[in-house]
Amino acid sequence: MNYTTNTITIRPIKEDDLHRLWELSFKDKDPEWKQWDAPYYPHEPMPYEKFLERKDKIVEQDDFWGIEAEGKLIGMVSYYWEHKPSLWLEIGVVIYESAYWSGGYGTKALTMWIEHLFTTMPLVRVGLTTWSGNERMVRVAEKLGMTMEARIRKVRYWNGVYYDSIRMGMLREEWEAHRSK
């Protein structure tokens, strides 16, 4: 299963994607994308062989899909359970290559990802957590119709500055109203 627009496709990761995904995500010690994706958590590069040990958690999984543009992998969308018994699910997106930032790729990918999740799961809500230093991510969530549900002030510390943790969310009925516009 995959979803496609005129510019991108989201789809499960295939074994053929592993080397490219490793290059984008774990090859470098200080990748540029990490400045926006929770930079207050350490990022550890890893050798390709060690990355391959995780392939069973990456290839053809329901919770981790690739974003493809112009025939190549440029990012990923994911989800994790904050609390599975209550179906509290959080989503994420990373566009690894800066050439694809601010081009609508993340917005399109998350639109398709949210549609996929609401279509295939009995969810009542989808959430997204980011930080106040990533203003682009906050804008994407707002464009998608998400509501800022919580702003926990000055709990993220990076490069000598405190930032807020931002929790955005959307109920199924809000998504249905948003997508019908």
Question: What do the predicted segments below correspond to?
Answer:
Residues L52-K55, V138:
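Short amphipathic alpha-helical segments and helix-helix/interface helices
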Residues M1-R20, L24-D28, F64, E68-K181:
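Acyl-donor (CoA/ACP) binding surface of acyl/acetyltransferases
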Residues D30-E53:
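Conserved GNAT-fold acetyl-CoA-binding loop/helix
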Residues K55-Q61, M146:
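Short loop/turn motifs at secondary-structure junctions and domain boundaries
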